[in-house]
């Protein structure tokens, strides 16, 4: 294992509901109510730190899982001895450029989360790579990934990417995380037929479109964007989780073919009526808080979801009713959690 006499890395846990939980390792899973990153907990590189010389780091040629987290590394070099490495984590360093990885042909996972990288480059030798995380960097474009045909998970969260492009060769891709960027249009995803999870929270997207080819998609998160209409989801027949909170949606519609939905998050929009979802019989979680629901009869739309367990309706006009919780319990007897509180029996 690579070792260096520095302080232990700080663990981060950002509550990130609906966003990708897998960027990076299992110990730093990220979730957030609206797809935004908590400024108090988000990772941050500290440019005033002086980079260390890689010569001071001891590398074990036999090591398969190499951990070089928070080591103040300024340049990728000296890793050619790690011919057996399957995973390398270089997160929370001071790296400005991806380079000197040509010898790591057996690498399966590369973690460059929270550095100062401006360009995706010099990855062509990593043809066995299955997971790449370059979140929390300074990327402006998706590029340089053509040879990574085996990549299943790609995390580019919190960069400065303006458009979805150059992903055509990633036909094995199952998870794509592009949250917290500058994307305005959903596009160029047609070739990603294996994609199962797509995260686009906290961008500048105005329309749900160009998703027709994603037949295997089970999770779609487009929270904190500028969407005003529920549309373009008719071909996503395998969708199980849909996160659309913090947009400008006014009408519940367009979900006729999404019969497998188990989680529907449409909180913090402009919806006045719960409608057009009585066919969602597999629904287990329904998030409708921070809207404009005022009619108790609307809950009839949820009665066919016999396994419904969680309902969020707080900060709607309904909540002003003194019998708020009791009426929800009577209308939806299967529910075990109302807003943030579990029901006591």
From Swiss-Prot:
The keyword ATP-binding does not apply. InterPro entries: Cilia_flagella_integrity, Leu-rich_rpt, Leu-rich_rpt_typical-subtyp, LRR_dom_sf, U2A'_phosphoprotein32A_C. Residues 13-30 have a biased composition (Basic and acidic residues). One of its GO terms (cellular component) is cytoplasm. The keyword Protein transport does not apply. Its main location: nucleus. Gene3D superfamilies: Ribonuclease Inhibitor. Residues 1-53 are annotated as: Disordered. Residues 316-345 form the LRRCT domain. LRR repeats lie at residues 62-83, 84-105, 106-127, 128-149, 150-171, 172-193, 194-215, 216-237, 238-259, 260-281, 282-303. It holds the Pfam family LRR_9. Transmembrane segments: none annotated. It is found in: Nucleus. Signal peptide: none annotated. Keywords: Leucine-rich repeat, Nucleus, Repeat. Belongs to the SDS22 family. Regulatory subunit of protein phosphatase 1. This is Protein phosphatase 1 regulatory subunit 7. It comes from Danio rerio.
């Amino acid at each position: 294992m690579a070792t260096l006499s520095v302080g232990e890395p700080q663990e981060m846990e950002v509550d990130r509901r609906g966003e990708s939980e897998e960027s990076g390792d299992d110990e730093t899973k990220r979730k957030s109510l609206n797809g935004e990153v908590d400024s108090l907990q988000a990772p941050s590189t500290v440019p005033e730190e002086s980079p260390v010389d890689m010569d001071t780091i001891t590398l074990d040629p036999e090591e398969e899982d190499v951990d070089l987290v928070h080591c103040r590394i300024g340049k990728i070099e000296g890793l050619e001895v790690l011919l057996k490495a399957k995973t390398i984590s270089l997160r929370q360093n001071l790296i400005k450029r991806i380079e000197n990885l040509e010898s790591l042909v057996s690498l399966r996972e590369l973690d460059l989360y929270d550095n100062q990288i401006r360009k995706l480059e010099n990855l062509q030798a990593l043809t066995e790579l299955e997971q790449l995380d370059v979140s929390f960097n300074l990327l402006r474009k998706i590029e340089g990934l053509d040879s990574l045909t085996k990549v299943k998970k790609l995390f580019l969260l919190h960069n400065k990417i303006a458009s979805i492009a150059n992903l055509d060769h990633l036909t094995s891709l199952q998870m794509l995380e592009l949250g917290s960027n500058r994307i305005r249009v959903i596009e160029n995803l047609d070739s990603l037929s294996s994609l199962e999870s797509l995260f686009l929270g906290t961008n500048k997207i105005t329309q749900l479109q160009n998703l027709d080819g994603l037949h295997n998609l089970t999770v779609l998160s487009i929270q904190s964007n500028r969407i005003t209409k529920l549309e373009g989801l008719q071909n996503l027949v395998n969708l199980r989780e849909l996160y659309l909170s913090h947009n400008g949606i006014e009408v519940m519609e367009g979900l006729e073919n999404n019969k497998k939905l188990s989680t529907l998050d449409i909180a913090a929009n402009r919806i006045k009526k719960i409608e057009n979802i009585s066919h969602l019989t597999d629904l287990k979680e329904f998030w409708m808080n921070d809207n404009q629901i005022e009619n108790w009869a609307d809950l009839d739309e949820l009665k066919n979801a016999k396994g419904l367990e969680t309902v969020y309706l707080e900060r709607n006009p309904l909540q002003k009713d003194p019998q708020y919780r009791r009426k929800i319990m009577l209308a939806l007897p299967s529910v075990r959690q109302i807003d943030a509180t579990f029901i006591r029996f």
